[in-house]
């Protein structure tokens, strides 16, 4: 378990600042398999997870969904045969917040508890 995954998400208001470039790289080092992408001018954190079949991918999607509901912070999830793409960003602030990195670390823990193809 990473230290980052042990942190609690904090309430994020619309005027909360996005993480700085330095924070992005520092926090990103704790979730090295995630990549930072920019879509429509919004920085996002994304990772693709692979599984042996659709049932495992769907089970993982539901586990991430449960995690998201518990924290009140929700990703974009694309579920395909043997693959799930998870994308975290803070909708209210239109970019990355520390919460996104916390949730990425927690998503990694969910993945580690599942049987995966890779």
Swiss-Prot record:
Family, according to the entry, reads as follows: Belongs to the pterin-4-alpha-carbinolamine dehydratase family.
The answer to whether the entry has keyword Protease is no
Q: GO:BP terms for this protein?
A: tetrahydrobiopterin biosynthetic process
Kindly give the SUPFAM superfamilies that the UniProt entry links to this protein: PCD-like
Q: Entry's Gene3D superfamilies?
A: Transcriptional coactivator/pterin dehydratase
**What is an example of a Pfam family matching this protein?**
Pterin_4a
Q: Which Enzyme Commission number(s) are on file for it? A: 4.2.1.96
Protein name as it appears in the record: Putative pterin-4-alpha-carbinolamine dehydratase
Organism listed in the record: Chromohalobacter salexigens (strain ATCC BAA-138 / DSM 3043 / CIP 106854 / NCIMB 13768 / 1H11)
Q: Which reaction does it catalyse?
A: (4aS,6R)-4a-hydroxy-L-erythro-5,6,7,8-tetrahydrobiopterin = (6R)-L-erythro-6,7-dihydrobiopterin + H2O
Key words of the record: Lyase
Does Lyase count among this protein's keywords? yes
Q: Which GO terms describe its molecular function?
A: 4-alpha-hydroxytetrahydrobiopterin dehydratase activity
């Amino acid at each position: 378990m990473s230290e980052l995954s042990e942190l609690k998400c904090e309430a994020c208001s619309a005027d909360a600042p996005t993480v700085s470039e330095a924070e992005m790289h520092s926090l990103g080092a704790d979730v090295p398999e995630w990549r930072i992408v920019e879509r429509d001018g919004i920085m996002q954190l994304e990772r693709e997870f692979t599984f042996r079949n659709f049932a495992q991918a769907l089970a993982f999607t539901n586990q991430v969904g449960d995690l998201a509901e518990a924290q009140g912070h929700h990703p974009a999830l694309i579920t395909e045969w043997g693959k799930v793409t998870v994308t975290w960003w803070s909708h209210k602030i239109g970019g990355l917040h520390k919460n996104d990195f916390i949730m990425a670390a927690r998503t990694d823990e969910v993945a580690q508890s599942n049987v995966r193809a890779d």
